[in-house]
Structures are given as C-alpha cells and as structure tokens.
C-alpha cells in the first residue's frame, strides 16, 4: 500500500454529554466531498488521548460509514503502552479501518531499544497496514530513523511513517532512507510544501479542517511541477501558521493549538465544535479576533 496525498486529521466536536457524532459526520462528509485522500478522526488534533476507547471506536465507525470506499479511513491509537495499543487496534480492525497509526510510547523519554521492543510487541499481534509515528512534542523524544528502518524491515504491514517532529533534516533522512519502501508523510501544515518538494509522499494534516481545498491545491501544484505557484500559496498561509502553531506545534499560543483548529473550523464550516475537552483551555476574545482576521485575509470567511 502506498499512501499519497492528504489525510485529514480531523477535530472532534463535543457536546455537553460527550462527542457530537453528528457534527463529526458533517465535517467528515465535507472533507470527503472536497476530494481529500483520507480521514483520520482519532488524531492528536482530534484530542484522541482524551477520548475513551468507546468514543474512539464510535468515531471510527462514523468515519467508516461516511468515507468507506471513497477515502482512506485511518485510526490512531493514542495509547502509550503495548497492551492498550493492541486492544484498541483490534477494536479498530473490527470496525474495518484501512490503516492504523501507532502512537509511540509517551510520558517517559524512552531509549531506542525500548521503542523498538514496543513496536515488536505490537506488530507481532497486529496484522493490518500500519503507519509509524514520531511526535516529540508529546513524547519528549524523537525516534531514530534507524529504528523505523529496523521495524519496517521486519514487518511487512508497515506502510508509512508520519513525521511531526518539525526537524527538517530528520525529515530528509526519512525520505532518503525509507522513501522508496514506505510512504513518508509530513505531520505539520507549515512544512507540507517543502516536504513534497523534497520527495515526501503526502501529509497527515489538520489544516484542511477549515482550509477547504487549499491543501489539496498545494499538493496538486507540486505534483504538476508548478513549484513557484506552490511556494507562493505556502507563503500566503505563513501568517496563519505562525499564529496557530508551526514547527513543534507550539506557535504563539502554546498548548491551545487544538482549540484554535476547532474554533477556525467552526468559523469556516459553520459546524458547532463545542468546547475543547478539559484540561485544554478555550481561547480568549483577543485571540479569537486575531484568528478571525487571519481567516478573513485568506478569504475563508
């Protein structure tokens, strides 16, 4: 399996009593209709670590109903140990998801041997297409490219690597060492066009929650060799990414980035996103006004 194009890491709409599944269904429907290659509800942007296993499975059931046969349905584990990872993977498999994205172990800064052992324990029990993942913001460490190479050499179900490190030298190593065998996928909107230009196969990105077809247009321009136009569109979005979060997903407002994506999605799509799930904080009026101005400058609202 080769994953190419844009998989959208969707935000999770909440109601007072839990996940707003109808809101999620509406969002997924719009994204699929726009032509994106995949959807990924149980993502970091989707606040996966704050969802119960039941909520995660239900979200993936909705995604399968909406996108099945029209776009890849990708499920994220959001777990930090091998037993929970295997359990949620089996439940996702029963739903019929297309690809499993495995969150690396977090909370403790593990060495490469521990991470390698984690992958072996999981992949010995999980037989479905898998994307490996590095996200130092959440784990406190970056996974050596050589670990991904070892795992991919041993397990044929590994089909890709998602890189949310923000380290472009590291990303180039992934492309150089693994790009002929695996799909190398950029995890940060800010680096999507530069990654494509250097040979990445696509991205797993949150921007399309509210950008409409803009991210697809970036992908098309690069694939058609229209580099100057792709770079111009990339630069047009830079003020937004500087505000919302760029390399490392921190940006101006620190840990509020998932909330920003939800607020932007509600502004553009008109779908009630509800509040972020605690302890994620809301944004204040000043930040809301700045976000609104940036979206207006782009003609999105």
Curated annotation (Swiss-Prot):
It comes from the Archaea. One of its GO terms (cellular component) is cytoplasm. Coiled coil: none annotated. InterPro entries: Aldolase_TIM, DapA-like. It is found in: Cytoplasm. One of its GO terms (molecular function) is 2-dehydro-3-deoxy-phosphogluconate aldolase activity. Signal peptide: none annotated. Its EC number is 4.-.-.-. Pfam families: DHDPS. It is an enzyme of class 4 (lyase). The active site is at 44 (charge relay system), 107 (charge relay system), 133 (proton donor), 162 (schiff-base intermediate with substrate). Gene3D superfamilies: Aldolase class I (3.20.20.70). Keywords: Cytoplasm, Lyase, Schiff base. CDD domains: DHDPS-like (cd00408). Belongs to the DapA family. Homotetramer. This is Uncharacterized DapA-like lyase Tneu_1812. It comes from Pyrobaculum neutrophilum (strain DSM 2338 / JCM 9278 / NBRC 100436 / V24Sta).
